[in-house]
Amino acid sequence: MTVDLHDFVATVEDYPEPGVSFRDISPLMGDGVAYKQAVDAIADFAKHLNVDLIAGPESRGFIVGSPLAYAMNIGFVPARKGGKLPREAVSASYTLEYGGVNELEIHKDAIKPGQRVLIVDDLLATGGTINATREIIEKLGGIVAGVAFIIELESLQGREKIMKAGEVPFLALMEY
């Protein structure tokens, strides 16, 4: 049984600020069939990429990446917000969609040189968190094997920003 994943995305107008249509995947995560379908679709995309690890930025990248890593029987690497990891980490900064700067970090020993990593997140907006995650993976000697999202907000041109950093296989299950 397949479902239309669009039916499981709630749109919240004027959140987090006026003029923004926030796409909330909470209903998708709350429905076992839709959630499994989304994870399985990304796993199907990833199986041809010879992926060693899944990486996801905090926090919804964890929600997509953890079940994906489990389904593929590979490890998951969290890209945490700055200052959240207890051991030596490598970091990168990025500009927030609504202004300001943030930082992501990954433990220094989480990715070995040459490992192929798929970066996943719930939603692609400007591409800042993905490019920061990519920068860290590459600093650690990893190879970004591709990127995958449940939703892409096309008007924010995140895909173009990701590809400007280097072409990689790309998947978005839904575009808005």
UniProtKB/Swiss-Prot annotation:
Q: InterPro entries, alphabetically?
A: Ade_phspho_trans (IPR005764), PRibTrfase_dom (IPR000836), PRTase-like (IPR029057), UPRTase/APRTase (IPR050054)
Record's GO cellular component terms = cytoplasm
Its name, as the record gives it, is: Adenine phosphoribosyltransferase
The record's similarity note reads:
Belongs to the purine/pyrimidine phosphoribosyltransferase family.
Q: Does the keyword Acyltransferase apply?
A: no
CDD domains listed in its UniProt record: PRTases_typeI
Q: What is its EC number?
A: 2.4.2.7
User: Origin, by domain of life?
Assistant: Bacteria
Q: What is its main location?
A: cytoplasm
The protein's assembly and partners: Homodimer.
A GO BP entry: AMP salvage
